[in-house]
Amino acid sequence: MEDFVRQCFNPMIVELAEKTMKEYGEDLKIETNKFAAICTHLEVCFMYSDFHFINEQGESIIVELGDPNALLKHRFEIIEGRDRTVAWTVVNSICNTTGAEKPKFLPDLYDYKENRFIEIGVTRREVHIYYLEKANKTKSEKTHIHIFSFTGEEMATKADYTLDEESRARIKTRLFTIRQEMASRGLWDSFRQSERGEETIEERFEITGTMRKLADQSLPPNFSSLENFRAYVDGFEPNGYIEGKLSQMSKEVNARIEPFLKTTPRPLRLPNGPPCSQRSKFLLMDALKLSIEDPSHEGEGIPLYDAIKCMRTFFGWKEPNVVKPHEKGINPNYLLSWKQVLAELQDIENEEKIPKTKNMKKTSQLKWALGENMAPEKVDFDDCKDVGDLKQYDSDEPELRSLASWIQNEFNKACELTDSSWIELDEIGEDVAPIEHIASMRRNYFTSEVSHCRATEYIMKGVYINTALLNASCAAMDDFQLIPMISKCRTKEGRRKTNLYGFIIKGRSHLRNDTDVVNFVSMEFSLTDPRLEPHKWEKYCVLEIGDMLLRSTIGRVSRPMFLYVRTNGTSKIKMKWGMEMRRCLLQSLQQIESMIEAESSVKEKDMTKEFFENKSETWPIGESPKGVEEGSIGKVCRTLLAKSVFNSLYASPQLEGFSAESRKLLLIVQALRDNLEPGTFDLGGLYEAVEECLINDPWVLLNASWFNSFLTHALR
């Protein structure tokens, strides 16, 4: 930045800025952004004054350089850039000769035509915010304020801009040029973020008129005026005072502020009980795909055509049988449902022309699986209000479940790389501004780190399934439509690939409200034997449906192929959010960006390239019982993405509550680590609020276990 300033600004301006910084005891080698800001401000003040004169008639005129009348009186007196004592001498002299009111702070210019002092502001923030800060600082009705920004905006007292449009345009153009020059060298972001507000911002901002009346009316009880209240707040000592006030409120309220020490927090209590079970809407690490490469068949892109083509790639089908029954379900119905799907797909293949959609016959097994006619009949309240024992359904408390190891395995798998790419680089036009160039560069680096990630596959799978299900729910409300579960990707060699995970059959879907439920049966292929972790598959009936030949180090081996079948349900609002799962990419990109920004502001240059290309550097990823886990920047990207994706896949009220309440505890612990000596009252109540969310949800239980690891290592 220092080199840039010396190249970009006139040596006289640079010299003045150096003197100013020396006067205030600031080191320009360290405060390089401050150095650039002072130079910019000086240049704007000089440009403001340039070419403006007053003729013998007292009129303001503009005279370009080289004009013979250059002996005219300058319209503006420049105060900025002078030695402090000289500057105050000039101000005093002006006040004595013109009768102007003496300002509290040194202004930048004096305008002999309008007879007023001018405060010039150059801001990297919003002009109106900076204007208010200046107004609050000067406190003088007489000092005129004129603010310029690097984006070409300006603001002045009473919209009186003093100069003609051309002179102001010259200043704006120069500021825009400085911004572009900085951006092209990767200096702009750091410079933009380094601006601090006016030092005297804490001084009182006078409130008058209506606002004053409103302020006086909205005071808490027992305060007669705003000044009274301000004095009370300024002299407020929290400890002891809060306790005293609370004890006056009620005999039941008793809050002592306890110091929060390293020994204060205890681990969260995770529930005991049977292990938690899988509750995602589709299989994750256990899913198996039937795939076709370079699809070019007739009707390619029509889901049903693609599904049939994928089904034809497998030849190991066999008579299906139940290997892991669903405890509460009628398992033969699940078996019959799969047989029905196979039979109806065979019927389609025998037809001359394959239809675009397939509605299943409403057999007894599908009616049972989809809960047809199972909903209790709705009766008008007026017809039954005389019934004596009218009551709401008894609903059982949810059964407590313990954390199982499978959910950590699922998360680890989601962070891994697959051998296919699941998203394309956006086709976006040429970058116009330097900031767009940096944004594109970051997006491209990030995309290359996550495009092959399994979490990205889950995003695309989720988007496809939810879109297809919502479309079918609206287009075929009464039908049991067969919906293939499909995704598309590219192989390492860049060849297109279409994958089939299984099928969904949707039930009746007259969805009037956002929360109205549509039932569906999912049937998904897998090579995972459910008998290895039966607790994970509590909600599923699992069939063995074939044998698959797999290549291995010892040649080809045959593995049984399973079908995971379950009844499930979703709503319009859940499907809407499922369709928008791509937002997870954006959320994790923004988290990475804030890491880059933090690094860039320390180094005072854009660190995007170094951030992604320095393969030797490791970053903290998360906490585990072993301590802080570290990994490459790519691993960080994929871990953040997987967390965001799991928040979407396992969204629930338990997760909402846990995230909100545990965050409070996290902030207290963080304050302790930062030596801020936090105090708490009713810490037990906070623990209760967190722990009431730990019931049976696998993702929430895993997050709670991570939280405990964090507590252990953070407070060592």
Curated annotation (Swiss-Prot):
<keyword id="KW-1104">Inhibition of host RNA polymerase II by virus</keyword>
<keyword id="KW-0378">Hydrolase</keyword>
<dbReference type="GO" id="GO:0006351">
    <property type="term" value="P:DNA-templated transcription"/>
</dbReference>
<dbReference type="InterPro" id="IPR038372">
    <property type="entry name" value="PA/PA-X_sf"/>
</dbReference>
<feature type="binding site">
    <location>
        <position position="80"/>
    </location>
    <ligand>
        <name>Mn(2+) 2</name>
    </ligand>
</feature>
<feature type="short sequence motif" description="Nuclear localization signal 1 (NLS1)">
    <location>
        <begin position="124"/>
        <end position="139"/>
    </location>
</feature>
<keyword id="KW-0479">Metal-binding</keyword>
<dbReference type="GO" id="GO:0042025">
    <property type="term" value="C:host cell nucleus"/>
</dbReference>
<keyword id="KW-1048">Host nucleus</keyword>
<feature type="binding site">
    <location>
        <position position="120"/>
    </location>
    <ligand>
        <name>Mn(2+) 1</name>
    </ligand>
</feature>
<dbReference type="Pfam" id="PF00603">
    <property type="entry name" value="Flu_PA"/>
</dbReference>
<comment type="function">
    <text>Plays an essential role in viral RNA transcription and replication by forming the heterotrimeric polymerase complex together with PB1 and PB2 subunits. The complex transcribes viral mRNAs by using a unique mechanism called cap-snatching. It consists in the hijacking and cleavage of host capped pre-mRNAs. These short capped RNAs are then used as primers for viral mRNAs. The PB2 subunit is responsible for the binding of the 5' cap of cellular pre-mRNAs which are subsequently cleaved after 10-13 nucleotides by the PA subunit that carries the endonuclease activity.</text>
</comment>
<dbReference type="GO" id="GO:0030430">
    <property type="term" value="C:host cell cytoplasm"/>
</dbReference>
<comment type="subunit">
    <text>Influenza RNA polymerase is composed of three subunits: PB1, PB2 and PA. Interacts (via C-terminus) with PB1 (via N-terminus).</text>
</comment>
<dbReference type="GO" id="GO:0039523">
    <property type="term" value="P:symbiont-mediated suppression of host mRNA transcription via inhibition of RNA polymerase II activity"/>
</dbReference>
<keyword id="KW-0255">Endonuclease</keyword>
<feature type="binding site">
    <location>
        <position position="41"/>
    </location>
    <ligand>
        <name>Mn(2+) 1</name>
    </ligand>
</feature>
<dbReference type="GO" id="GO:0039694">
    <property type="term" value="P:viral RNA genome replication"/>
</dbReference>
<keyword id="KW-1035">Host cytoplasm</keyword>
<feature type="binding site">
    <location>
        <position position="119"/>
    </location>
    <ligand>
        <name>Mn(2+) 1</name>
    </ligand>
</feature>
<keyword id="KW-0597">Phosphoprotein</keyword>
<feature type="short sequence motif" description="Nuclear localization signal 2 (NLS2)">
    <location>
        <begin position="184"/>
        <end position="247"/>
    </location>
</feature>
<keyword id="KW-1157">Cap snatching</keyword>
<dbReference type="GO" id="GO:0003723">
    <property type="term" value="F:RNA binding"/>
</dbReference>
<comment type="similarity">
    <text>Belongs to the influenza viruses PA family.</text>
</comment>
<keyword id="KW-1190">Host gene expression shutoff by virus</keyword>
<dbReference type="InterPro" id="IPR037534">
    <property type="entry name" value="INFV_PA"/>
</dbReference>
<keyword id="KW-0464">Manganese</keyword>
<keyword id="KW-1191">Eukaryotic host transcription shutoff by virus</keyword>
<feature type="binding site">
    <location>
        <position position="108"/>
    </location>
    <ligand>
        <name>Mn(2+) 1</name>
    </ligand>
</feature>
<dbReference type="GO" id="GO:0039657">
    <property type="term" value="P:symbiont-mediated suppression of host gene expression"/>
</dbReference>
<dbReference type="GO" id="GO:0046872">
    <property type="term" value="F:metal ion binding"/>
</dbReference>
<dbReference type="InterPro" id="IPR001009">
    <property type="entry name" value="PA/PA-X"/>
</dbReference>
<dbReference type="GO" id="GO:0075523">
    <property type="term" value="P:viral translational frameshifting"/>
</dbReference>
<dbReference type="GO" id="GO:0004519">
    <property type="term" value="F:endonuclease activity"/>
</dbReference>
<feature type="binding site">
    <location>
        <position position="108"/>
    </location>
    <ligand>
        <name>Mn(2+) 2</name>
    </ligand>
</feature>
<dbReference type="GO" id="GO:0075526">
    <property type="term" value="P:cap snatching"/>
</dbReference>
<keyword id="KW-0540">Nuclease</keyword>
<keyword id="KW-1262">Eukaryotic host gene expression shutoff by virus</keyword>
<protein>
    <recommendedName>
        <fullName>Polymerase acidic protein</fullName>
        <ecNumber>3.1.-.-</ecNumber>
    </recommendedName>
</protein>
<keyword id="KW-0945">Host-virus interaction</keyword>
